[in-house]
Amino acid sequence: MQTLIAFLVMFGVLVSVHEWGHLYFAKRAGILCREFAIGFGPKLFSWKRNETVYTIRLIPLGGYVRMAGEDPELITIKPGYEVGLVFNEKNVVSRIIVNNKSKHPEAQVVQVERIDLERELFIEAYDDDGERKRWDVDPKAEMVQDEEATQIAPYDRQFGSKSVAQRALAIFAGPLMNFVLAFVLLAAYGFMQGIPVEDPVVGNIAENSAAETAGLQKGDYVLSIDGQTLETWVDMTMIIQQHPNEEITFEVERAGQILQIPVTPNQVEGMDGEPIGLVGIERPAPEPATLVSGLQFGATQTYTYMTMIFDVLRLLVTGQFSLDYVAGPVGIVNYTGQAAEMGIFVLLQWTAALSVNLGIVNLLPLPALDGGRLVFLGLEAVRGKPLDPSKESLVHFVGFALLMLLVLVVTWNDINRLFL
């Protein structure tokens, strides 16, 4: 239960922040945002605030902001249709009743002759006496079908009416907010826990550990292992983990002397089930954070996570890293549970790492992702006109289908690795 709760909270935060970036900058550009959704599939909860419906959906695999003009309107009214019109105090159409008109006795039933709900905002129709009349339509008028109201979207409120720069910012803002979230989480970690010591210095040593048996001491500065020069604590731990049950030689500086100390790391099981080496040393105690060092830590750690993720992507593309080791939804849930068991501070770091990952993956130039949409906007800027919307939608649909197929593959890998 703890694992599930931790995952749902983390997922909600990551996706909410990402989609809020889209929502905020889209609204700043004047785009009508019809829905802000966390999750996909059937709707679990919903509420409406101002012009936007906020929904929580069943499948926790992402989220979306539905902007007017990105997809064809679900309700169309053509000449010859009978609709009910509800007017405001200025005799301007405020609601258009598409069906079930008998449930709206306040509506005047008319037969549509001409209608424009995008640019001129008017309805011409014949009333009960056969007289043809014209009414202005409120820019925020609603169409009611099956007792569900949908606000109309004049052209100047649609995604396509905005400049390339405005649309690009609305799309890029999602990944950008993930990077900002990672920075905030890591800076908060630094302020609460202190700034971790990056140098390869030995901290506390566990009793009866490989390090104690070999003669390592607290305060030893590790210069190299088996001739490999070290710059950071992470460099040291990675080399140790790569040599379970294998003797390696630590070159350490102690009280001005250089010592060569052979150590044989114990073999333990890593988070992914693979064997790793462990010598039983801890990192030195963190240093108290100042305002500057805390913010600097948040920025440098965010950058470090970004470079690590780019390195993995490069290895994937070049075939040097197997897709079998990429965690899918099941793997992420499992690792989130392990992070939660280790404490709130480990969970903070894990959430920050996933936030950076979400931001970078979304910027990949692939259909259905934010990066793919930015590519289409770039092509529009070069050509001076947008591509055929139907063709672009088809590309994104195919891309989304392939993305879901990839999710299924890595999910199977998760199940095979963790449970079979």
UniProtKB/Swiss-Prot annotation:
Transmembrane domains' residue ranges: 5-25, 168-188, 315-335, 344-364, 392-412
Enzyme class at the top of the EC tree: hydrolase
Cellular component terms (Gene Ontology): plasma membrane
Membrane association type: Multi-pass membrane protein
Cofactor (UniProt): Zn(2+)
Family: Belongs to the peptidase M50B family.
PANTHER family with a match to the protein in the record: MEMBRANE METALLOPROTEASE ARASP2, CHLOROPLASTIC-RELATED, REGULATOR OF SIGMA-E PROTEASE RSEP
Protein name: Zinc metalloprotease RasP
Source species: Halalkalibacterium halodurans (strain ATCC BAA-125 / DSM 18197 / FERM 7344 / JCM 9153 / C-125)
Primary gene name: rasP
